[in-house]
Regions:
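Core catalytic lobe of class I
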Residues: 1-216
Length: 216
């Protein structure tokens, strides 16, 4: 049975990509899944697609970008391109490239997101000092105009680069940690807080380690 149209408020998921993980021979029909996700997402709903790229014969595949563009072809807005930065990672001393520390978190929306509950964080001492000063903003004609200090207070809205542990400390669930493609519980929690409200319907079409369901 299919889900009804315009049914899901928020999807938070990380698909298998570029053959980096095997799922008991399960095939991954991306285009079919993308179309279905658009169909079942409510107007104003959000899809968070957490994905990276493999390196094959010396070149990154670019799969993440291809998928993002296809979601836009399906009708989604690319609301934000966020970064999941990993604190713990496996260094590759042999590769002639810098170690990969991040994955993309593409935030797609069906029209404008109906919900945004911003998460704040403490400002650094340097930021607090800067906020006490007047800010000069360059105008289109090249002149400068004093701007109001809009960034007041000791906290600020988080940026779109989120940093998490990605080892055994990222979950208290032993069964979840044994899954080959776990993402941090706090990451799922932060997206659920940001893009949904109580009693909204949260979805993960892959449900690998159950992190999204657990945090919802």
């Amino acid at each position: 049975a299919k889900m009804p149209d315009n049914f899901i408020d928020l999807t938070v998921t990380s698909p298998p990509y570029d053959g980096l993980r095997t799922y008991n021979g399960y095939s991954f029909p991306f285009e079919e899944i993308a179309k279905e996700l658009y169909r079942v997402t409510k107007q104003g709903g959000v899809l968070v697609w957490i994905v990276g790229d493999a390196t094959v014969k010396g070149s990154e595949t670019g799969t993440s970008f291809k998928q993002a563009l296809y979601f836009m072809q399906c009708g989604f807005n690319l609301h934000d391109t966020m970064i999941y930065q990993k604190i713990s990672y496996m260094p590759n001393k042999k590769a002639k490239r810098y170690d990969g520390l991040f994955e993309f978190m593409f935030v797609f929306s069906k029209n404008t997101p109906k919900t945004f509950n911003e998460i704040t964080e403490e400002r650094t001492n340097i930021e607090k000092s800067i906020c006490k000063k007047d800010i000069m903003v360059r105008q289109k004609d090249g002149s400068f105009k004093k701007s109001e200090r809009i960034n007041k207070g000791t906290t600020k809205k988080m940026g779109n680069v989120w940093t998490y542990l990605n080892n055994s400390n990222s979950t208290k669930d032993k069964i979840a940690f044994e899954h080959p493609a776990i993402f941090p519980e706090q990451l799922a929690n932060d997206h659920i807080i940001s893009w949904s409200n109580e009693n909204d319907l949260i979805y993960d079409p892959f449900m690998g380690s159950g992190t999204t369901a657990k945090m919802a």
